[in-house]
């Protein structure tokens, strides 16, 4: 989550550095979470410094595969070219890993049992040809309270978005900042 600290924007701490073509595993996720925790304890995670969600504890958390919130920004392809948006989205980059495979790893490890929300962003998430398959892969029967938040410019109609809205699976946040 983004926030300001001493007039500087912070947040957006990257959990896993992706290598082209290599899908992260649950073990990668656990190791990355532990590394970020250790960096925060040593004040070496600049992106997190000043975050109001941090708190002191004497108990080191367990780094299991459990996911409470998941933000998926696996590509930066967009169908607009807004002047306020970062240039990395102009033209965009495709995903470096198989997102469906990663979601399946999480499913197999019962990671979504306590998950509240999965957020889809990064460019225009509905442009991914596997968007419907990926969103549908998260087993909602494991946690009926889980929902998906899709950040979209809502310029392009997508059958899956309508279906997911009708089924109550997703909520959309439309970004129409008149930046085009």
Q: For the regions a protein language model found, what residue spans apply to each?
A:
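A generic secondary-structure signal
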Residues: 105-109, 137-141, 163
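Accessory C-terminal segments flanking Radical SAM cores
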Residues: 1-58
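Leucine-rich repeat
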Residues: 98-107, 132-134, 160
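Core AdoMet radical
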Residues: 67-77, 86-100, 112-129, 141-158, ...
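Short, non-ligating residues that shape and space the ligands of small metal-coordination modules
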Residues: 57-60, 91-92
